[in-house]
Amino acid sequence: MAKIIGIDLGTTNSCVAIMEGNTTKVIENSEGARTTPSIIAYQEDGEVLVGASAKRQAVTNPRNTLYAVKRLIGRKFTEKEVQKDIDLMPYTIAAAENGDAWVEVRGNKLAPPQVSAEVLRKMKKTAEDYLGETVTEAVITVPAYFNDAQRQATKDAGRIAGLDVKRIINEPTAAALAFGLDKHNDGKGGDRKIAVYDLGGGTFDISIIEIADVDGEMQFEVLSTNGDTFLGGEDFDQRVIDYIIAEFKKEQGVDLSKDVLALQRLKEAAEKAKIELSNSTQTDINLPYVTADASGPKHLNIKLTRAKLEALVEELIERTIAPCRTAIKDAGVSTSQINDVILVGGMTRMPKVQEKVKEFFGQEPRKDVNPDEAVAVGAAIQGQVLAGDRKDVLLLDVTPLSLGIETLGGVMTKMITKNTTIPTKFAQTFSTADDNQPAVTIKVFQGERELASGNKMLGEFNLEGIAPAPRGMPQIEVSFDIDANGILHVGAKDKGTGKENKITIKANSGLSEEEIQKMVKDAELNAAEDKKKLELVQARNQADAMVHSVKKSLAEHGDKLDAGEKEKIESALKDAETALKGEDKAEIEAKTEALMSASQKLGEKVYADMQAAQAAAGAAAGGGEAPAAEATASKPADDNVVDAEFKEVKDQK
């Protein structure tokens, strides 16, 4: 049976894991790394690079290298978080026709799910290379605080990548699964409440989760969740970049903020410095030839201490504490009732973050969970549960934000409150606001504000054909149904006429089914195109090697061939070199074959010369000893001879 893989689609890095029996396995990518940078580069020749190769060329191709695209997924262009990123990113963020935030690369507008699909495709390929079979199903993780639109967009990305997304699972919940089963397997299980503090590259989540043993089954119940989907390592990097720009301007009088190439180098240097300062107290940021002016090239050399870094990002770390406070309150527990604090996400390696977490929860956070891999591992465990290969795990997740509809006066009437265990259903009866009202518009919102306008509108639909009646008389039942992925389905039914209308909330933006299908087809075409390119490269390499080999042999042994043979080989060589300049794979292969055939006689000459040279060398070195060796070998074995170890002992004189 095909495996359901677990994918942590991260803002900065992504990771893929599978279950092998009851053991989890994080799969290394083609570069041998267990995590892959979530970076995608679009080359001039149409090639798409993903991961480390995309990261390596970012400095020379900043406008067409996309990173942190997860921050845009499922968002509108007008949202303040998106507007903030427009000024910071070297690539172009543009408004799509439906109002979504898209990116523009080489004159083409791309939807964030389409870009994220490239990373998912790399994860899929990584798993397929390891398993030796096609992978079609996956569990993909999202930040717990992702809204409906962001979850839908992530699911769409999976479809575009050729994956059937069996479940969207919250990142902290996945980490709790990995932690809980690990502790259960080492015999240190039992009922416990844990806090998962997840500070990644672009998002922050906090979840309070209860792990209980119920009749031999491990039950993971999320008590509450909170967070900020626009707070993470990228923001920490930006603080360092801003500091470097300010210092350089003070020293050199040059503003680097308008230099796209310099900014890309600064980003790389800032990230490196931030990571180094988790293990050392000071680091040097050295960027020779960072820019130039009329006086010549400028070099950047700045010392950054851990204390300075902590001062720069203190406010960002502090911003994670308010959601922690809310999550504890919503869960109905106190910090003293938390048994374990789990750190997830690369940013939790920062000593100041660990210190802040310890200060809030009153205990040392655990260090035995890999912050980069735990989420993918948890997703793989959930995949095993969904495949029916594991029966001892039950996961009870929650919806992170309240869901409701707009009622008279623009009020948000909550249908499902935040932190409700999912899947769940809820129905409530409403009526009309005007006499003889023939239709009602159901506007669906997500958020905690009292007025609907302060929340995120997810979608709207009409229920038409209401029988004429005084206001307040018609009975309209509105039902909300959240599935296990946290995706919402809404229905409205006129109890009087029996008329009803239902929608799966796709947000009032998002990708249409046709757009998704087109992107799936484009992805398949790209895969076929990539295969063609690979085959062409292989044919070219083979031809190149053949040309080189024949040229070398011709230079060394060509004088032993008659003129006709030599001319034939030289002609075939010329044809092969001409074919190599083109893009026709069949032509390259045909000319390589012809060269191979034409150079057969040359090969025979080379082989004959080698044999003769070896025979001559053997005769010169061996002299008359060879027959003696043969004679020795033919003597019968002495039955009394035994194998023994010996050591040389010098005579004592």
UniProtKB/Swiss-Prot annotation:
It holds the Pfam family HSP70. The modification Phosphothreonine is found at T203. Residues 644-653 have a biased composition (Basic and acidic residues). It comes from the Bacteria. Residues 613-653 are annotated as: Disordered. PROSITE patterns: HSP70_1, HSP70_2, HSP70_3. Keywords: ATP-binding, Chaperone, Nucleotide-binding, Phosphoprotein, Stress response. GO terms for molecular function: ATP binding; ATP-dependent protein folding chaperone; unfolded protein binding. Induction: By stress conditions e.g. heat shock. Gene3D superfamilies: 1.20.1270.10, 3.30.420.40, Actin, Chain A, domain 4 (3.90.640.10), Substrate Binding Domain Of DNAk, Chain A, domain 1 (2.60.34.10). NCBIfam families: PRK00290.1, PRK05183.1, prok_dnaK. Belongs to the heat shock protein 70 family. Acts as a chaperone. This is Chaperone protein DnaK. It comes from Methylibium petroleiphilum (strain ATCC BAA-1232 / LMG 22953 / PM1). The lineage of its organism: Bacteria, Pseudomonadati, Pseudomonadota, Betaproteobacteria, Burkholderiales.
